[in-house]
């Protein structure tokens, strides 16, 4: 099933944002009971709305095809059994092959994040592994079932550098990880200057 996305002039309560309306193919840019809305600011999706314009703020995510489709499925805009493709303006489809995402983009305070590998262009992703996060600390590294590895308890900073190190060391991912659906805390100098490599080494030494 094909949907099309058009720009809207209205921004509603989101000043400085660009509004997009999503309709079924050939329905045109008008507002109907099947319409859905996406609000974008600084090239990030900041909110979505249904046809009644009941809005939901989301943690800002890059305005990409994959992120748009994930939000659409999180909010049940489309039937999961249908192959949906959105054509339109605005989104950048250049995207890393690997991402780290909250279990649901709709969650404001996620605790479990999954590493995912994009299998092909249209929506398909493969679960690679995951991490648990509490109070901005990575507390556990999760392997897929049947992987033959035990999950590992760790105590690591929840930063982009360490996320990429975990992906490389534990899951053999040599691509940059795109963090989706969640804004990482700002990186601050720790009280004890422990390097990333030392943290990873200590985690390895404590593997059970």
Curated annotation (Swiss-Prot):
Disulfide bonds: none
UniProt keyword annotation of DNA-binding present: no
GO biological process per UniProt: symbiont-mediated suppression of host innate immune response
Keyword Aminoacyl-tRNA synthetase: no
InterPro entries on file: AdfA-like
Swiss-Prot/TrEMBL keywords: Host-virus interaction, Inhibition of host innate immune response by virus, Viral immunoevasion
Pfam families membership: AdfA
Family: Belongs to the Anti-DarT factor A family.
Protein function: Plays a role in counteracting the host DarT defense system.
Name by which UniProt lists this protein: Anti-DarT factor A
